[in-house]
């Protein structure tokens, strides 16, 4: 295969600017699938992706395009990427396997927060960026304004940018020409050098075992080759290899410059790490390819199976998901209230949501999640720094000097009409104003420094509602800062409930604790004695609600008669309730925790 006829590219864009639809049209245009096989979002393989209309997993396909200009067949390797801020890691991995990127911009929405961050990722990987203006068939499309925005904010020349409608398939041929003319072929790849293949993704197949998606940088790999993973020196014999078109197509050999998949009967999921380099065991490469910087989770939460008998199944399921999503981290934990569970680290709230939904759908495991938390740094009295991801791990107040929390630089692009609302929201969430610049005549980009914990605490939903859905957010972690943070414990009848302990800012502690207490009061069933629900910081009670006792009518058998008789019965009841309260345990049904934690 001549290298000059190969093009490796990905499609990047903000959410809803039409990446997956454009991928569909490109696949259609190359006649890779028959009309019967085509369906919308063909590259989004998970049901969740189709339902939510978002891309979560990157996906790589090989397309053959016959160019009428020079009468040649070109091999396009298209890698579809997610657009949501939580899945930036997926984008960076797919870009490392390409030479170019199509930057899709919506002709009515223009440049948005995620558009910019994806451009920076592409520039970091030295990719050739081809701007594409999409949705030109919309009545609200303003092509000239969007072209000027791209030129001003990103610095890309848009004079020859393809103007397309991915929905109707208008001008898709312009994109094909731009891919051939502007994206460079992988000429630095050499079939004769020792094998170097970058693993940019992996998934689990019930029959083939763990399957690696690879970009062959140098050399070639055949069925029967003994391959070696350079990070752990484990060796395997290749049992099958090929490409996706999006159908799985088996081949005998993959050569330098190609993007495909390799199966080698790998049973242990942990043998594969994304970003690793595969080489030939008989003729190994001396150096591995530069992989990816390991991304660290931003949000932690405990996941517990509602049915405790499913715990072992849950562990297996999480291992399988981990294979295709190496940004997930997990460790085993137990809770008095919820039993055995796993504490997981996620890239953001959407990532957490998606993993929970995948566990529910693909493995039929219903889960309960504790309140999400970020990583705090605790400066101990002896000067060492302890990193904690849950309130349960916070040491006693006497053992540390201060708590630091992560701050994020949040860039919000918002129409002028909603600027006041957005700035007020940021102030309410402990935001610190940094910058305000014009994006165009009707929109501003405002930059705030906001604690990551606040972004996790319903900030995104509030941002959408206060801007009627028009504001877009992009954030990155900047640094850790000392804050007045406290641990709030919830007591039921004087007993601490570990699953409900949280770390929060002192300023918001009483208000948020009151909400938790009220929620508990709604859901806890009545007992024979009254139950105090208290939120405490150390020994100080900052919020309290009471679940009143069930009252048995002890006077029912007294018809008239002496009042002292009635008083005596009421006194006896009062004494009994007092005794019960001292020795009685509050039994909180498991589904009460499910309700409380799912509402939080």
From Swiss-Prot:
Its EC number is 3.6.5.n1. Residues 4-187 form the tr-type G domain. Its main location: membrane. GO terms for biological process: positive regulation of translation. It holds the Pfam family EFG_C. Transmembrane segments: none annotated. GO terms for cellular component: plasma membrane. NCBIfam families: lepA, small_GTP. Required for accurate and efficient protein synthesis under certain stress conditions. May act as a fidelity factor of the translation reaction, by catalyzing a one-codon backward translocation of tRNAs on improperly translocated ribosomes. Back-translocation proceeds from a post-translocation (POST) complex to a pre-translocation (PRE) complex, thus giving elongation factor G a second chance to translocate the tRNAs correctly. Binds to ribosomes in a GTP-dependent manner. This is Elongation factor 4.
């Amino acid at each position: 295969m001549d290298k000059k006829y190969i093009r490796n590219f990905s499609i990047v864009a903000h959410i809803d600017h039409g990446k997956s639809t454009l991928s569909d049209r490109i696949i259609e245009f190359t006649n890779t699938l028959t009309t019967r096989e085509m369906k919308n979002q063909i590259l989004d393989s998970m049901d969740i992706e189709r339902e939510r209309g978002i891309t979560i997993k990157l996906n790589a396909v090989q397309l053959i395009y016959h160019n009428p200009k020079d009468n040649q067949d070109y091999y396009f390797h298209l890698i579809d990427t997610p657009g949501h801020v939580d899945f930036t890691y997926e984008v960076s991995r797919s870009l490392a396997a390409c030479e170019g990127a199509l930057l899709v911009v919506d002709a009515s929405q223009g440049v948005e927060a995620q558009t910019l961050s994806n451009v920076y990722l592409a520039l970091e990987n030295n990719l050739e960026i081809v701007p594409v203006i999409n949705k030109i068939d919309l009545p609200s499309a303003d092509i000239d304004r969007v072209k000027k925005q791209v030129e001003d904010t990103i610095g890309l020349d848009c004079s020859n940018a393809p103007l397309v409608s991915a929905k109707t398939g208008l001008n898709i041929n312009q994109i094909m020409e731009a891919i051939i003319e502007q994206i460079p072929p992988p000429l630095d790849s050499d079939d004769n050098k020792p094998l170097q293949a970058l693993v940019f993704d992996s998934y689990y197949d019930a029959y083939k075992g763990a399957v690696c998606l690879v970009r062959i940088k140098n050399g070639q790999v055949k069925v029967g080759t003994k391959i070696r993973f350079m990070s752990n020196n484990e060796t395997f014999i290749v049992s099958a290899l090929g490409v996706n078109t999006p159908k799985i197509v088996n081949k005998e050999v993959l050569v330098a410059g190609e993007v495909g998949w390799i199966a080698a009967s790998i049973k242990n999921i942990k043998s594969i790490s994304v970003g690793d380099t595969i080489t030939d065991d008989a003729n190994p490469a001396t150096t591995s390819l530069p992989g990816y910087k390991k991304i660290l989770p931003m949000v932690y939460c405990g996941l517990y199976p509602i049915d405790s008998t499913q715990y072992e199944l849950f562990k297996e399921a999480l291992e399988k998901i981990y294979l295709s999503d190496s940004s997930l981290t997990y460790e085993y934990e137990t809770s008095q209230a919820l039993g055995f569970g796993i504490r997981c680290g996620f890239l953001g709230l959407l990532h957490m949501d998606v993993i929970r939904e995948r566990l529910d759908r693909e493995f039929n495991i219903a889960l309960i999640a504790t309140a999400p938390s970020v990583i705090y740094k605790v400066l101990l009295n002896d000067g060492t720094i302890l990193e904690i991801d849950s309130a349960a791990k916070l040491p006693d107040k006497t053992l540390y000097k201060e708590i630091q929390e992560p701050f994020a630089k949040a860039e919000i692009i918002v129409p002028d009409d909603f600027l006041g609302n957005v700035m007020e929201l940021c102030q309410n969430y402990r935001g610190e104003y940094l910058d305000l610049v014009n994006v165009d005549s009707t929109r501003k980009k405002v930059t705030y420094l906001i604690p990551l914990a606040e972004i996790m605490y319903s900030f995104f939903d509030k941002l959408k509602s206060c801007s009627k859905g028009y504001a877009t957010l992009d954030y990155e972690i900047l640094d850790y800062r000392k804050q007045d943070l406290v641990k709030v414990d919830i007591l039921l009848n004087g007993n601490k409930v570990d699953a409900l302990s949280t770390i929060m800012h002192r300023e918001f502690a009483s208000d948020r604790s009151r909400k938790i207490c009220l929620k508990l009061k709604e859901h806890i069933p009545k007992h024979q004695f009254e139950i105090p629900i208290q939120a405490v910081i150390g020994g100080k009670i900052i919020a309290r609600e009471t679940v009143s006792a069930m009252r048995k009518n002890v006077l029912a058998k007294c018809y008239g008669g002496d009042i002292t008789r009635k008083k005596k019965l009421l006194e006896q009841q009062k004494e009994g309730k007092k005794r019960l309260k001292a020795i009685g345990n509050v039994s909180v049904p498991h589904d009460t925790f499910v309700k409380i934690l799912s509402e939080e």
